[in-house]
């Protein structure tokens, strides 16, 4: 594990593989390992993959102040620069997609292409706002209940049913034990306040937006809103829940590789 100092934060990040730079940005409550670790064998032969843990995740440490998207974007960029992989392709998941949007808008000279999975621009939508407020409350009062809620809203019904009782228990228990709950609480506050709409309008990089047809955390309508704002963005959809890269990593990797390795993409 590597570290780079950014403001008051000591940002941890992983480097794997060889080739051009590919930076993966995790989502709320996730980290570089739980969101991306299982995908490394499919990526590291073609890219040098950098996986930062932004504030609130992994072993990254800071003073605990309120999170801002520009500061998290700066942390991700600093990790990429420290790893010497600029320019790079960027992949963001959920809150990480909002961070990627901010980076592509504010650091265009560093970015080649971007992929956004389960993306949203803001939580102005009342359903999304209510959901994140519920997450915030359950982090304080009942983390096991929140873990069950994330399972039910984060995966497709068929995927959950196929796990059986024991499989579902394993997933729930892994959420309870592996999530950095205090850090997630800070990230949820950012989910509630974030708005990268203006940044999205400034993006001029090739962009692939991946929605998820069974997503009940960030419905695919949110991803389609991103497509309407980013000039020239492509849209495709996976038949999964929000946690598509965990539910169906093979299909996610196929989409990722097809876009990032395409000779038709500048």
Swiss-Prot record:
Keywords: Hydrolase, Serine esterase
InterPro entries reported for this sequence: AB_hydrolase_1, AB_hydrolase_fold, Meta-cleavage_hydrolase
UniProt keyword Transferase, yes or no: no
The enzyme's E.C. designation: 3.5.1.-
Phenotype when the gene is knocked out: Cells lacking this gene are no more able to produce pyrrolizwilline and accumulate pyrrolizixenacetamide.
The protein's enzyme class: hydrolase
Catalytic activity: pyrrolizixenacetamide + H2O = 3-amino-5,6,7,7a-tetrahydro-1H-pyrrolizin-1-one + acetate + H(+)
Family: Belongs to the AB hydrolase superfamily.
Protein name, entry field: Pyrrolizixenacetamide deacetylase
Organism: Xenorhabdus hominickii
Source lineage: Bacteria, Pseudomonadati, Pseudomonadota, Gammaproteobacteria, Enterobacterales
């Amino acid at each position: 594990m590597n570290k780079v100092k950014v403001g008051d934060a000591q940002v941890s990040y992983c480097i794997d593989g060889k080739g051009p730079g590919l930076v993966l940005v995790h989502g709320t409550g996730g980290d570089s390992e739980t969101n991306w670790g299982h995908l490394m064998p499919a990526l590291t032969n073609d890219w040098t993959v950098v996986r930062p843990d932004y504030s609130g995740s992994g072993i990254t440490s800071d003073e605990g102040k309120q999170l801002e998207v520009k500061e998290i974007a700066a942390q991700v960029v600093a990790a990429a620069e420290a790893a010497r992989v600029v320019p790079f392709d960027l992949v963001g998941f959920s809150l990480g997609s909002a961070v990627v949007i901010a980076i592509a808008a504010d650091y265009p000279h560093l970015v080649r292409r971007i992929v956004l999975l389960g993306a949203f621009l803001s939580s102005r939508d009342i359903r999304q706002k209510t959901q994140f407020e519920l997450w915030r409350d359950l982090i304080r009062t009942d983390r096991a209940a929140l873990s069950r809620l994330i399972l039910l809203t984060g995966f497709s019904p068929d995927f959950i049913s196929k796990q059986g009782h024991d499989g579902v228990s394993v997933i729930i228990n892994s959420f309870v034990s592996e999530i950095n709950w205090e850090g997630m609480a800070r990230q949820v506050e950012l989910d509630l306040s974030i708005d990268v709409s203006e940044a999205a309008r400034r993006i001029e990089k090739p962009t692939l937006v991946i929605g998820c047809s069974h997503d009940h955390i960030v419905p695919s309508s949110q991803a389609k809103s991103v497509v309407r704002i980013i000039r020239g963005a492509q849209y495709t959809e996976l038949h999964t829940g929000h946690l598509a890269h965990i539910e169906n990593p093979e299909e996610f990797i196929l989409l990722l590789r097809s876009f990032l390795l395409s000779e038709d993409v500048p």
